[in-house]
Amino acid sequence: SSISEKIRCNAKVNDNLQQQAMALYAEMFLNSSNNDVTSGTLSDIAVITMGQSPSGSSYNEDGVGEVFYQGRAEFGFRFPKRRLFTTEPKRMAVAGDVLLSVRAPVGDLNMAYERCCIGRGLGAIHSKTGHSSFVLYTMFALRSQLNVFNGEGTVFGSINRDALNAIPIDVPLVTKIDQFEAVAHPIDELIRTNYEENCRLEAIRNSLLPKLMSG
Protein backbone atom coordinates (compact mmCIF):
# COMPACT_ATOMS: atom_id res chain seq x y z
CA SER A 1 0.00 0.00 0.00
CA SER A 2 1.05 3.63 -0.39
CA ILE A 3 1.06 3.98 3.42
CA SER A 4 3.61 1.16 3.71
CA GLU A 5 5.69 2.75 0.94
CA LYS A 6 5.71 6.10 2.77
CA ILE A 7 6.76 4.35 6.00
CA ARG A 8 9.60 2.60 4.15
CA CYS A 9 10.62 5.85 2.49
CA ASN A 10 10.78 7.71 5.84
CA ALA A 11 12.85 4.87 7.34
CA LYS A 12 15.27 5.08 4.42
CA VAL A 13 15.55 8.86 4.77
CA ASN A 14 16.26 8.48 8.51
CA ASP A 15 18.98 5.92 7.83
CA ASN A 16 20.55 8.33 5.35
CA LEU A 17 20.29 11.27 7.77
CA GLN A 18 21.98 9.28 10.54
CA GLN A 19 24.79 8.29 8.19
CA GLN A 20 25.31 11.96 7.26
CA ALA A 21 25.58 12.95 10.93
CA MET A 22 27.99 10.06 11.59
CA ALA A 23 30.12 11.14 8.62
CA LEU A 24 30.20 14.71 9.94
CA TYR A 25 31.23 13.44 13.39
CA ALA A 26 34.01 11.32 11.87
CA GLU A 27 35.18 14.27 9.76
CA MET A 28 35.27 16.71 12.69
CA PHE A 29 36.45 14.49 15.54
CA LEU A 30 37.88 11.17 14.35
CA ASN A 31 39.70 11.76 11.07
CA SER A 32 41.04 15.26 11.56
CA SER A 33 44.51 15.76 13.01
CA ASN A 34 42.91 17.81 15.74
CA ASN A 35 45.29 18.97 18.45
CA ASP A 36 42.63 20.99 20.24
CA VAL A 37 41.45 18.08 22.37
CA THR A 38 42.06 17.08 25.95
CA SER A 39 42.20 13.49 27.12
CA GLY A 40 39.22 12.77 29.29
CA THR A 41 36.55 10.22 30.10
CA LEU A 42 32.86 9.84 29.32
CA SER A 43 32.05 11.29 32.75
CA ASP A 44 33.50 14.63 31.56
CA ILE A 45 30.69 15.12 29.05
CA ALA A 46 27.80 13.08 30.45
CA VAL A 47 25.91 12.02 33.56
CA ILE A 48 25.18 8.29 33.61
CA THR A 49 22.14 6.74 35.26
CA MET A 50 21.99 2.96 35.54
CA GLY A 51 18.52 1.47 35.25
CA GLN A 52 16.78 -0.32 38.07
CA SER A 53 13.74 -2.52 37.53
CA PRO A 54 10.53 -1.71 39.41
CA SER A 55 8.57 -4.56 40.97
CA GLY A 56 6.89 -6.78 38.40
CA SER A 57 3.48 -6.18 39.94
CA SER A 58 3.68 -2.51 38.90
CA TYR A 59 3.90 -3.31 35.17
CA ASN A 60 0.95 -2.79 32.84
CA GLU A 61 0.23 -2.37 29.14
CA ASP A 62 -2.65 0.05 29.68
CA GLY A 63 -0.70 3.31 29.74
CA VAL A 64 -0.91 3.74 33.52
CA GLY A 65 2.13 5.45 35.09
CA GLU A 66 5.47 6.03 33.35
CA VAL A 67 6.67 4.48 30.09
CA PHE A 68 9.05 1.66 31.06
CA TYR A 69 11.85 0.01 29.09
CA GLN A 70 13.46 -3.10 30.55
CA GLY A 71 16.26 -3.44 28.01
CA ARG A 72 17.16 -3.48 24.35
CA ALA A 73 14.21 -5.73 23.34
CA GLU A 74 12.14 -2.59 22.76
CA PHE A 75 14.82 -0.78 20.73
CA GLY A 76 13.97 0.50 17.26
CA PHE A 77 16.12 2.26 14.66
CA ARG A 78 16.38 5.40 16.84
CA PHE A 79 13.65 5.31 19.48
CA PRO A 80 12.32 2.38 21.54
CA LYS A 81 8.80 1.05 21.07
CA ARG A 82 6.34 1.65 23.92
CA ARG A 83 5.09 -1.61 25.36
CA LEU A 84 5.13 -1.52 29.16
CA PHE A 85 4.31 1.08 31.80
CA THR A 86 5.06 1.10 35.52
CA THR A 87 3.32 2.75 38.46
CA GLU A 88 6.47 2.46 40.61
CA PRO A 89 9.26 4.04 38.52
CA LYS A 90 12.73 4.00 40.07
CA ARG A 91 15.37 5.34 37.65
CA MET A 92 14.39 7.80 34.92
CA ALA A 93 15.73 9.03 31.59
CA VAL A 94 14.56 12.21 29.84
CA ALA A 95 13.90 12.92 26.16
CA GLY A 96 17.18 13.14 24.25
CA ASP A 97 19.15 10.90 26.62
CA VAL A 98 21.09 8.09 24.98
CA LEU A 99 19.77 4.69 26.08
CA LEU A 100 22.54 2.11 26.21
CA SER A 101 22.19 -1.64 26.55
CA VAL A 102 24.38 -2.49 29.57
CA ARG A 103 23.78 -6.26 29.48
CA ALA A 104 24.68 -8.63 26.69
CA PRO A 105 24.90 -7.49 24.04
CA VAL A 106 26.49 -4.40 25.58
CA GLY A 107 26.59 -1.33 23.36
CA ASP A 108 23.27 -1.27 21.49
CA LEU A 109 21.96 2.30 21.40
CA ASN A 110 18.68 4.17 21.18
CA MET A 111 17.54 7.62 22.19
CA ALA A 112 14.80 8.37 24.71
CA TYR A 113 11.82 9.83 22.86
CA GLU A 114 10.22 11.01 26.10
CA ARG A 115 10.64 10.84 29.85
CA CYS A 116 10.77 7.14 30.72
CA CYS A 117 11.68 4.67 33.43
CA ILE A 118 14.65 2.41 32.65
CA GLY A 119 15.14 -1.15 33.89
CA ARG A 120 18.39 -2.86 34.78
CA GLY A 121 19.19 -3.76 31.16
CA LEU A 122 19.72 -0.08 30.31
CA GLY A 123 21.77 2.95 31.21
CA ALA A 124 20.87 6.56 30.36
CA ILE A 125 23.60 8.91 29.17
CA HIS A 126 22.70 12.57 29.61
CA SER A 127 24.77 15.43 28.20
CA LYS A 128 26.10 17.75 30.91
CA THR A 129 25.99 20.72 28.54
CA GLY A 130 22.87 20.23 26.41
CA HIS A 131 24.81 18.68 23.50
CA SER A 132 22.56 15.63 23.08
CA SER A 133 23.57 14.99 19.45
CA PHE A 134 27.29 15.16 20.25
CA VAL A 135 26.83 12.63 23.07
CA LEU A 136 24.76 10.34 20.82
CA TYR A 137 27.34 10.21 18.03
CA THR A 138 30.18 9.92 20.55
CA MET A 139 28.44 6.78 21.84
CA PHE A 140 28.12 5.43 18.28
CA ALA A 141 31.85 6.02 17.87
CA LEU A 142 32.55 4.14 21.13
CA ARG A 143 30.76 0.96 19.99
CA SER A 144 34.01 -0.98 19.48
CA GLN A 145 35.22 -0.02 22.98
CA LEU A 146 31.87 -1.07 24.45
CA ASN A 147 32.02 -4.36 22.58
CA VAL A 148 34.95 -5.39 24.80
CA PHE A 149 32.43 -5.80 27.63
CA ASN A 150 30.56 -8.55 25.81
CA GLY A 151 31.69 -11.75 27.49
CA GLU A 152 33.51 -14.43 25.54
CA GLY A 153 31.64 -17.70 25.07
CA THR A 154 29.41 -18.46 28.02
CA VAL A 155 30.42 -15.45 30.13
CA PHE A 156 27.50 -13.04 30.37
CA GLY A 157 28.57 -9.61 29.19
CA SER A 158 27.71 -6.49 31.15
CA ILE A 159 29.10 -3.06 32.02
CA ASN A 160 28.72 -1.10 35.25
CA ARG A 161 28.54 2.63 35.96
CA ASP A 162 32.19 2.97 37.01
CA ALA A 163 33.42 1.31 33.82
CA LEU A 164 31.15 3.53 31.71
CA ASN A 165 32.26 6.71 33.49
CA ALA A 166 35.89 5.74 32.95
CA ILE A 167 35.72 5.07 29.18
CA PRO A 168 38.50 7.22 27.69
CA ILE A 169 37.50 9.87 25.14
CA ASP A 170 39.08 12.91 23.52
CA VAL A 171 37.16 16.00 24.62
CA PRO A 172 37.12 18.65 21.88
CA LEU A 173 36.84 22.40 22.45
CA VAL A 174 33.31 23.54 23.29
CA THR A 175 33.31 25.76 20.19
CA LYS A 176 33.92 22.68 18.03
CA ILE A 177 31.17 20.74 19.84
CA ASP A 178 28.83 23.72 19.29
CA GLN A 179 29.66 23.69 15.56
CA PHE A 180 28.81 19.99 15.35
CA GLU A 181 25.62 20.38 17.38
CA ALA A 182 24.44 23.26 15.15
CA VAL A 183 24.37 20.86 12.17
CA ALA A 184 23.67 17.49 13.83
CA HIS A 185 20.83 18.57 16.12
CA PRO A 186 18.55 19.70 13.25
CA ILE A 187 19.34 16.37 11.52
CA ASP A 188 18.28 14.50 14.67
CA GLU A 189 15.13 16.63 14.93
CA LEU A 190 14.27 15.65 11.35
CA ILE A 191 14.79 11.97 12.24
CA ARG A 192 12.39 12.49 15.15
CA THR A 193 9.80 14.18 12.90
CA ASN A 194 9.97 11.35 10.34
CA TYR A 195 9.67 8.82 13.17
CA GLU A 196 6.56 10.61 14.49
CA GLU A 197 5.01 10.57 11.01
CA ASN A 198 5.71 6.83 10.75
CA CYS A 199 4.04 6.22 14.11
CA ARG A 200 0.92 8.06 12.86
CA LEU A 201 0.99 6.18 9.54
CA GLU A 202 1.36 2.82 11.30
CA ALA A 203 -1.61 3.66 13.53
CA ILE A 204 -3.70 4.54 10.45
CA ARG A 205 -2.60 1.38 8.65
CA ASN A 206 -3.39 -0.79 11.69
CA SER A 207 -6.86 0.73 12.03
CA LEU A 208 -7.58 0.31 8.30
CA LEU A 209 -6.37 -3.28 8.02
CA PRO A 210 -9.29 -4.95 9.87
CA LYS A 211 -11.76 -2.88 7.80
CA LEU A 212 -10.04 -3.88 4.56
CA MET A 213 -9.91 -7.53 5.60
CA SER A 214 -13.62 -7.61 6.45
CA GLY A 215 -14.49 -5.76 3.23
Which residues does each PLM region occupy?
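Short, flexible segments with low predicted structural confidence
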Residues: 64, 89, 106-107, 151, ...
